From Swiss-Prot:
PANTHER family: ATP-DEPENDENT CLP PROTEASE ATP-BINDING SUBUNIT CLPX-LIKE, MITOCHONDRIAL, ATP-DEPENDENT CLP PROTEASE ATP-BINDING SUBUNIT CLPX-LIKE, MITOCHONDRIAL-RELATED. Keywords: ATP-binding, Chaperone, Metal-binding, Nucleotide-binding, Zinc. This is ATP-dependent Clp protease ATP-binding subunit ClpX. Component of the ClpX-ClpP complex. Forms a hexameric ring that, in the presence of ATP, binds to fourteen ClpP subunits assembled into a disk-like structure with a central cavity, resembling the structure of eukaryotic proteasomes. It comes from the Bacteria.
Amino acid sequence: MSSNTGGSDRELRCSFCAKGQDEVKRLIAGPGVYICDECVALCNEIVAHEDAGEREEMDRLLTPAEIKARLDEYVIGQHQAKKILSVAVHNHYKRVFYAEALGGEVELEKSNILLIGPSGSGKTLLAKTLARVLKVPFAIADATTLTEAGYVGEDVENILVQLLQNADYDIEAAAKGIIYIDEIDKISRKGDGPSITRDVSGEGVQQALLKIIEGTEANIPPKGGRKHPQQEFIRMDTSNILFILGGAFIGLDKIVDQRSGGGSMGFGAKVSNRKDRPLGELLDQVHPNDLVKFGLIPEFIGRIPVVTHVDELGEEDLIRILTEPKNALVRQYQKLFELDKVTLRFTANALKSIASQAIERKTGARGLRNVMENVMLDIMYSLPTLEGVKECIINRAVVEKGREPVLIYDTEAKTGS
């Protein structure tokens, strides 16, 4: 392969390895460059190796300790719940990954999980973080919006539609995803006995959820159920979808306390003060019968073998949530200020006041953002118009009384009035 330019012969060479055209089988020309067949093969090998490495990292089954360590990066406290979740999730995906190797010798059941705990204690965050760590599609549903098919409200199949959409319509990926259903305690049946009227948003929803939670071939409408009745349905196997169900279950502790003797009545009965027994201790002792008495049907409870609880967050927990996780609120605001070349600092008392306000609102960790937004609104509104500010200090007076922050300039310190 030679090229004549202006009557002179010039040997062409690979722009990458510098081998001449006579040393290789083929030389491919580009705009001002050449690449030989050997370099093309080497590039393909490098790309294939990197892709295989990425797939291996993605497909490798994390150990329970590795899963918990990843959860620790984003979720403060709740160590027992994280340990139980890590083991359950590890066993679930072990069942998924090694299904063929197991054959028909032993049938491993799904490790669906029930998370009990007050609002703002981190139930949703735990489920979200698990999906992020495992790199699987994730969907959240609110149980209070669900009804039986044919009634006003969301069909349970719409949960699967959302998961499929979040998986970019990759049915294989969606079939190994995680679905978190919040407020599951709100679909408890009304009364202890079977209802003579149709309970379409309570026991009826539990019945509708049974099959997809256990594992079934579900027909789902890719565009949602009721607005597009003529669409073709997609079949999705839910056998390998991990379901995490969460709820506050207010009053469940009293049921446990009564069963375990704390609510004894009658002559000679030992009088026990409910306040003497911590909430966490009672929730550690939850039995399936307690959940039945609360209002979940036995068949539904049978599909959720793993039950754990998250503790109510105290002031110290909330302060740690503000500052320690990778996506901590304080870090987020500091990064925003850093883009304006300003250092943002919170005093210890300011953080304590923010946590205290969230506790007063009874919103837990979820309320921290709302408190922070209220505190930072005026500061973030005026800061871009101020020149020469190099540091902004948020103290207790800013949080509790709405005072201006301490602003430190390049040449002088100025304290807001």
